[in-house]
Amino acid sequence: MGLPWYRVHTVVLNDPGRLLSVHIMHTALVAGWAGSMALYELAVFDPSDPVLDPMWRQGMFVIPFMTRLGITNSWGGWNITGGTITNPGLWSYEGVAGAHIVFSGLCFLAAIWHWVYWDLEIFCDERTGKPSLDLPKIFGIHLFLSGVACFGFGAFHVTGLYGPGIWVSDPYGLTGKVQPVNPAWGVEGFDPFVPGGIASHHIAAGTLGILAGLFHLSVRPPQRLYKGLRMGNIETVLSSSIAAVFFAAFVVAGTMWYGSATTPIELFGPTRYQWDQGYFQQEIYRRVSAGLAENQSLSEAWSKIPEKLAFYDYIGNNPAKGGLFRAGSMDNGDGIAVGWLGHPVFRNKEGRELFVRRMPTFFETFPVVLVDGDGIVRADVPFRRAESKYSVEQVGVTVEFYGGELNGVSYSDPATVKKYARRAQLGEIFELDRATLKSDGVFRSSPRGWFTFGHASFALLFFFGHIWHGARTLFRDVFAGIDPDLDAQVEFGAFQKLGDPTTKRQAV
């Protein structure tokens, strides 16, 4: 046929059997990729430290999605929360991966069958004997079936009525586990961080889809609407399908980047806004203040801070710290976290407590500035020593650690104090192993960043695809040069003036 590469899809334009075949093959490729990717990730995933080396630090992409839907066990005998198990059951990580690969193989065979046996009776219009699809009816069928799936997911899987539930955690990502979720039917269901909204919205949307599907199965579109929206043209289906996909991609890019109940930080890592707003830092200080109010010492109060919470309050876990073309997991960047050194408290020689100003998200370097409780600069690491007034040496800054591995240790040596002041710019201080993976020390993004970038990019691309194919189907006659009144115009002598319909000849 000699089609250029960008027009090859015309081979299935008027061939319903092979149109079905290529869609089944596409499903086979998607399911096959998902299953294969899951097996690859399981082969390289280290489940030994869910606190300091969780899945998102290791760059896992599909494991978090399986986990949020209720899969927590592996045939390798481990649990995602760090425990060991003896009976993981069929629906383990490997079981789900295997199911996708088996499904992919079946779809592959079905695609070949439909490619060979393309001329089926079901695709023929009995009135004309030509291949034809009743697109409004097919739309109704798909709407009904997707409504059933949506309702079933919300009413059974999420609620635990027939299924495991979903991943639910506290606002600080410390106590996450898979559990059933009750639908939230009040106004709280519209809060994107309330898990109950996932159940209620799927039930509501599924019900609407079922009713809408039945409507489109039982009511034919009016003729003017059918013609106006080009409902008989398969490119209309393509255009509206692309619209649905790009809209969904934009939505999930938003829920992933800004955070929601569907994207728990234990599975995908914290958001950049939690660093920008000092979200975890505030909670840590609140807990320490509560401990001090109970007559605990500073050392005791800081020692009770969970290592998991302290680790979230580290800039290396900020997904916006990754850079373009920085491939690899977070562990390949700043290294594998080994332990929390503790919280450094800086003081000048008068005993005044000083706080290191933290690095904003979009800075690679930032001046080391220490301020007091009123925000007044009291010490710094100067760029020019000759002009310095607040250097660590001049002000006599010391540092003492509370909690963590260096609990109770203090340093007064200026070089050591400056070292920890620089590290305190990045949040809580952790010991990082850069040797094991030959990590280069340059921050990487988390799967949260990759997912957002990928879906936002493809959503934009698909938006233009929707405009393109929508315009092609709506203005098909214009682009093709076909006019509804063309038959009258091409008749020789139909008009006194060529192409002017106002000068139509009268029959004698």
From Swiss-Prot:
Indicate where this protein resides in the cell: Plastid, Chloroplast thylakoid membrane
Record's keyword annotation contains Cytoplasm:
no
> Where is the chain membrane-spanning?
21-36, 101-115, 140-156, 203-218, 237-252, 457-472
Q: Which GO molecular function annotations are given, in alphabetical order?
A: chlorophyll binding; electron transporter, transferring electrons within the cyclic electron transport pathway of photosynthesis activity
Tell me which Gene3D superfamilies the record gives.
Photosystem II CP47 reaction center protein
What family is this protein classified in?
Belongs to the PsbB/PsbC family. PsbB subfamily.
This protein is called: Photosystem II CP47 reaction center protein
User: What organism does the record attribute this protein to?
Assistant: Barbarea verna
Report which gene this protein is encoded by: psbB
